[in-house]
């Protein structure tokens, strides 16, 4: 099978036309790849860290080392990298259920959370294993015109508020995702 010269010329023209869009993405990817590689080198990751383990995770030097790398790459205090977490909501549920206790209060500053997080909270129905079933209180600050109501934050934070939820993504709503700058403004 061969392609006509016109088809090949069109392909080259399209590739050339999209390069201004690809270059910035490729530059970011290269920068981040180098950041990860430099962090792996600084953490002294070797082939030994990728060897099989017993599966029970006792003395799993590989997992411990990779968590060290991930924490440093993302500028975090610690990282938890487990294949047992099957989704982002699963990881968030682990954090919420591990920290919040009966009588504590979780407040969403970005209005109604996305559907799977509503299940974790027990939003409309305190289902088995939800925060509401464990008597964790939940409240939310509705967004105004797709933006966080900065003037309403102080009024919604009360004595028993132990944790604040800021949902960056829009979930299934029509609002725009929050920018890092907006999150900094919320947390200032």
Language model region names:
Residues 1-7:
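Intrinsically disordered, low-structural-confidence terminal and linker regions
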Residues 72-73, 84, 95-102, 130-132, ...:
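Short, charge-rich binding segments
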Residues 115-118, 123-183:
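PLP-dependent aminotransferase-class I/II
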Residues 11-76:
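Glycine-rich phosphate-binding segment of PLP-dependent enzymes
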Residues 80-83, 108-109, 165-166, 188:
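General beta-strand structural signal in soluble alpha/beta enzymes
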Residues 54-62, 83-87, 142-145, 175-178:
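Catalytic cores of large soluble enzymes that bind and process phosphate-bearing ligands
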Residues 79-105, 113-124:
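Conserved beta-loop-alpha segment that forms the PLP phosphate-binding cup at the N-terminus of a helix
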């Amino acid at each position: 099978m061969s392609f006509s010269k016109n088809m090949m010329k069109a392909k080259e023209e399209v590739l050339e036309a999209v390069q201004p869009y690809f270059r910035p993405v490729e530059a970011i990817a290269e920068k981040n790849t180098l950041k990860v590689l430099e962090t792996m080198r600084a953490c002294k990751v070797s082939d030994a860290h990728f060897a099989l383990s017993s599966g029970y995770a006792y003395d799993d030097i590989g997992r411990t080392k990779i968590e060290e790398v991930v924490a440093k790459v993302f500028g975090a205090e610690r990282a938890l990298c487990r294949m047992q977490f099957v989704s982002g909501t699963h990881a968030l549920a682990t954090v919420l259920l591990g920290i919040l206790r009966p009588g504590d209060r979780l407040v969403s500053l970005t209005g109604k959370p996305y559907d799977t997080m509503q299940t974790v909270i027990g939003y409309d129905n305190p289902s088995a294993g939800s925060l509401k079933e464990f008597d964790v209180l939940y409240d939310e600050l509705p967004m105004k015109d797709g933006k966080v109501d900065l003037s309403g934050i102080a009024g919604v934070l009360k004595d028993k508020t132990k944790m604040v939820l800021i949902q960056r993504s829009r979930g299934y709503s029509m609002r725009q995702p929050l920018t890092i700058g907006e999150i900094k403004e919320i947390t200032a």
